[in-house]
Amino acid sequence: IKVKAAILRSGTDRPPEDYKNHLTRLAALQAYNQAGLGPEDMSVAEVHDATAVGEVIQIENLGFVEFGEGGPASLRGDTKIGGRIPVNPSGGLESKGHPVGATGIGQVFELVTQLRGEAGARQVEGAQNAIAENGGGLHGVEEAAACVTILGR
């Protein structure tokens, strides 16, 4: 399994209405560019969902859906295993736990397991590329820091 991109960015004082310049979105765009891939190339994602709205916000920021479509996409089942872009097959932070300081490596472990085809009942079939998004702290209206990692077979 190869690391195709790893981006760490710091938060800004952007106004809340400037959501298209969200820290995670900018980090994701940079990661996609570094990897030579796009959202459509991702087979599976692990995102920081310490709160229920986390998945909704981050699937928009990662470019899987248009802004404002994250909630409907999740409700349709687009983000479940077998959906258009499986998100958090590990169960996510609210389900498996949020070991602050180790959350990111837990996400990467899950994605490596997926890409190796070793995830058992949670396996995303045929996974080729995977993306992890992790954030922490608070700076204004977004994370103080965000990391986006893209892995591939």
Predicted segments, located by residue:
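Short glycine/threonine-rich loop-to-helix capping motif typified by GTGT followed
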Residues: 15-19, 49-72, 99, 138-147
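Short acidic capping loops at alpha-helix termini that bridge into adjacent secondary structure
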Residues: 39-43, 67
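Condensing-enzyme catalytic core mediating Claisen C-C bond formation in acyl metabolism
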Residues: 1-26, 30, 78-90, 95, ...
